[in-house]
Amino acid sequence: PGSIFFALKGENFNGNQFATQALKEGCSYAIVDEADYVTDDKRIILVDNCLSTLQALAHYHRKILGLPIIGITGTNGKTTTKELTAACLAQKFNVLATEGNLNNHIGVPLTLLKLTSSHEIAIIEMGASHPGDIKELVEITEPNYGIITNVGKAHLQGFGSFEGVLQTKCE
């Protein structure tokens, strides 16, 4: 109860297929982006793109709460830096931090949607596989502060070169 199901699509699944089941299992609403999955149930909401809608909702939620956010990125060391930063800040503040390494275009919005008015600061880990990824996550998150752990040559395939990695991490 109180949950919203977003019919996200993956390489091997189409979340739209599970919308009705999600409602049966207790979700309050199901967001779909294919008209074939809309029924007479008013709790099914048709949008142009479920992922974009999830990201927009997370951005809106972040703006409403308006608390400080620290964004963390880098070639490696993101998760450790996030955990250490969260542990230090938790000595004085009620902190929300990204769980594990859920640091992509889906994990970051889901983390932001966990923010409540009781939180005083958020630590958001941001990962990238391709140029533009960090820019997209920054637009959703609008961090007040940023930490770049380091920039290295790991995972060059998505960036083309070390310069591509550097450019992406500085987005």
List PLM regions with ranges.
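Phosphate-binding loop of NTP-binding sites
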Residues: 53-171
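N-terminal leader/targeting and accessory segments in enzymes
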Residues: 1-56, 60
